[in-house]
Amino acid sequence: VSLQGWGAGVLASTVDEALSEARTACLLAHPNIVTVHDFEIEGDYAYLVMEFVDGLNLSELLARVEGGYLTYAEAAHMISSLAKALQYAHENGVLHLDIKPTNIMIDRQGTVKLADFGMATLASAAGYGGARGGTVGYMPPEQVEGMLVDERADIFSLAVVLRQALTGVNVFAGRTAKESLDHIYKGPKIPLLKQDPEVPFAVDAALTQALSPEPSMRQGSVLEFAQEIVAPLGNE
């Protein structure tokens, strides 16, 4: 297991957020989601007991591989796994809202697991959750701007991660949220097919749709997005 703890003097909001994360994650039992086993408060201390993943996160992996990007087969496997995790979460009314390379774990057997549901919100009866801060460069416009979000926010973030995994570059990275928003609305300076002419056209089209600034233009579900990506990249 992995133990994450907070001692005396830790801001109450930090502990509250951690416990909210644990309660949310405990609802999600899935082979592609990092398991939270327990969460407790004892006096001035709070701790989470989580599954230990023996491996690397995607950011660490990209830093080690030649060229800083994944093969098509590796990317297909990653997206297939993450889509299953997210679809399960979405079906249970949970949004992730902070999908990024450091929250994607790959163990020594090649199993991909999504970690840190700290930004996750339980959706309302209408299926929507209030936007909360994720990570600049991976958040869609509606989340950056504090508007209502739904599953399509996670689709956008997943697409940003995939594009980065295929090219080694996050085209929406910015020093500020405003700078990142500008990149999103203007679109990537270098089209994907110019960065890698061998990328299947269907993958480029699916990414373009998923990265639309307008949520209604994106795919309707994370599984729909994965289906458009995995087969053209060569299945798993």
Where are each of the predicted segments found?
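Protein kinase catalytic-loop region centered on the HRD/HxD motif
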Residues: 84-94
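Activation segment signature within eukaryotic-like protein kinase domains
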Residues: 78-79
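C-terminal lobe helix-coil module of Hanks-type protein kinase domains
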Residues: 86, 105, 137-235
